[in-house]
UniProtKB/Swiss-Prot annotation:
Organism: Oryza sativa subsp. japonica (Rice)
Domain of life: Eukaryota
Region (Disordered): 185-230
The name this protein goes by in its record: Protein DEHYDRATION-INDUCED 19 homolog 3
Positions with biased composition (Basic and acidic residues): 218-229
Homology family: Belongs to the Di19 family.
Length: 246
């Protein structure tokens, strides 16, 4: 059953490749006799070679319909996404030759998606750095627009972000670091010094002050209060200047 499956897959791949080049009649049946002879000679080596032939036949190089550069199916999709996202003029599809007006990449992925699954495993291709940056900038622009337009969804997004942070230990460590910095900044903030009049109002009079005040005249008491006020003002200014310089 496996050998019949590989034989039929190889035949279908070769027919597709021949149809692309316009030589269906010349290429019909080519490779079938070779596969059968290899199956009779040896099993394991035949399977490896058959897989390589199938992969080569399944992924033929096709030309870009806009700049005519040769690519396989995977790299062609990456090339169209990066260099030809929206083309104004009509161009034929390099696979089915149907005339496509704008989005060639969407047509290939929707109409010819079977090409990515025809082999035993799908080929992986690296996304170019410029394409990755363009996708990232597009996501950032979308997030910015949602932040500007979606006023009613801000609370929901903040709740979702808080849930994601609590679920991710790395993000939660960042959150703890920010909270620690916030608490340190609060501790370094200058402490407001109360007014001198409020100090006099809140602080009860000491007994020795009452004895001194009783032994002084009214003018001397007024002079001592003035001196104490000047000293308090000077100390207050000195403390504030020291805090602001730090």
């Amino acid at each position: 059953m496996d050998s019949e499956h590989w034989i039929s897959s190889l035949a279908a791949a070769k027919r597709f490749y021949a149809a692309q080049l316009g030589h269906v009649d010349d290429m019909a049946g080519i490779g079938m006799e070779e596969v059968e002879m290899e199956m009779e000679d040896d099993g394991e080596g035949m399977e490896l070679e058959l897989e390589m032939q199938l992969e080569e036949a399944t992924w033929p190089d096709v030309a870009c319909p806009y700049c005519y550069e040769d690519h396989d199916i995977a790299s062609l999709c990456a090339h169209l996404e990066e260099d030809h996202p929206y083309e104004p003029h009509t161009s034929p599809c390099p696979i089915c030759f149907e005339k496509i007006t704008r989005d060639m990449l969407n047509h290939i992925t929707m109409q010819h998606g079977y090409l990515f699954k025809s082999g035993r495993r799908m080929r992986r291709f690296d996304i170019p750095e410029s394409q990755a940056l363009s996708l990232l900038s597009r996501d950032l622009r979308d997030a910015q627009l949602q932040a500007l337009l979606g006023g009613g969804h801000r609370q929901r997004r903040s709740n979702t972000t808080a849930t994601n942070i609590s679920a991710d230990p790395l993000l939660s460590s960042f959150g703890l670091g920010f909270s620690t910095l916030d608490s340190e900044e609060r501790s370094k903030a200058p402490v407001p010094i109360p007014d001198d009049t409020s100090i006099h109002k809140d602080t009860p009079a000491q007994p020795w002050e009452s004895r001194i005040d009783s032994s002084l005249t009214s003018e001397e008491r007024e002079q001592k209060r003035k001196q104490a006020t000047d000293r308090a003002t000077f100390v207050q200014g000195l403390v504030l200047s020291t805090l602001f310089e730090d």
